[in-house]
Amino acid sequence: MDIAILNTGCANLTSIQVAIKKLGYDSIVTSDPSIVLKSKKIFLPGVGTALAAMEQLHKKNLINTLKKLTQPILGICLGMQIFSQFSEECKGVKTIGIFDNCFTHLLKSSNLPLPHMGWNHIVFNNLHPLFKNIDKKERFYFVHSYIIPLNKYTLAKTKYGVSFSSVMQKNNFFGVQFHPEKSGDAGAQLLKNFLEI
């Protein structure tokens, strides 16, 4: 299977590549639109700011490439957030706009520290193939200060002061707010499920 990990310059690419390798799959780290378009599965990991990620995607001519995709793509953490229409980060950033009418906001909770860092539960519907063989008691590893509120594309939610989207899907575009590659067996199972969709 051809698996591409998008190199936005704003992510730890090694950890996701190692996690995929442990599942028995090879992947390629690339920012070449022609390779991305030919890949069967695509990962868009992201760490840092929406502004930096969008600048890199523009610079590498990947915005239109991403919008053309019909094969499954998984945005991880910031990768999911930039699928929204707009981020209030960095005084406002227009993002890719896959999840229409969805906006990324600062996680506002008066008595909890930011970033939201550590292990937390996700509340999901077992029937979705992304959650196959994942127990509802499992926890996943989060590191973020911005969220996408609950919306029509939300597949799973998490509470940290407020409830927010921790897994989203629109057609072939999937997103997770947590880091499956750092989430132990449950994260590995979710990656496996995505690769088998």
Swiss-Prot record:
Oligomeric state and partners?
Heterodimer of HisH and HisF.
Whichever gene encodes this chain, its name is hisH
List UniProt keywords, sorted A-Z: Amino-acid biosynthesis, Cytoplasm, Glutamine amidotransferase, Histidine biosynthesis, Hydrolase, Lyase
Classification via PANTHER family: IMIDAZOLE GLYCEROL PHOSPHATE SYNTHASE SUBUNIT HISH
Question: By its UniProt entry, which Pfam families does this protein fall under?
Answer: GATase (PF00117)
**Molecular function in Gene Ontology:** glutaminase activity; imidazoleglycerol-phosphate synthase activity; lyase activity
- Principal localization? cytoplasm
**Where is the catalytic site?**
77 (nucleophile), 179, 181
Q: Which GO terms describe its biological process?
A: L-histidine biosynthetic process
What is the protein name stated in its UniProt record?
Imidazole glycerol phosphate synthase subunit HisH
Matching entries from NCBIfam families are given as: IMP_synth_hisH
Q: Name one GO cellular component term.
A: cytoplasm
Pathway membership of this protein?
Answer: Amino-acid biosynthesis; L-histidine biosynthesis; L-histidine from 5-phospho-alpha-D-ribose 1-diphosphate: step 5/9
Q: Which reaction does it catalyse?
A: 5-[(5-phospho-1-deoxy-D-ribulos-1-ylimino)methylamino]-1-(5-phospho-beta-D-ribosyl)imidazole-4-carboxamide + L-glutamine = D-erythro-1-(imidazol-4-yl)glycerol 3-phosphate + 5-amino-1-(5-phospho-beta-D-ribosyl)imidazole-4-carboxamide + L-glutamate + H(+); L-glutamine + H2O = L-glutamate + NH4(+)
Q: What HAMAP family does UniProt report for this protein, alphabetically?
A: HisH (MF_00278)
Does the record bear Hydrolase in its keywords?
yes
What's the EC number here? 4.3.2.10, 3.5.1.2
Which residue ranges does the record assign to the Glutamine amidotransferase type-1 domain?
Answer: 2-197
Task: Give the protein's biological function.
Answer: IGPS catalyzes the conversion of PRFAR and glutamine to IGP, AICAR and glutamate. The HisH subunit catalyzes the hydrolysis of glutamine to glutamate and ammonia as part of the synthesis of IGP and AICAR. The resulting ammonia molecule is channeled to the active site of HisF.
The protein's matches in CDD domains, at most eight in alphabetical order, are given as: GATase1_IGP_Synthase (cd01748)
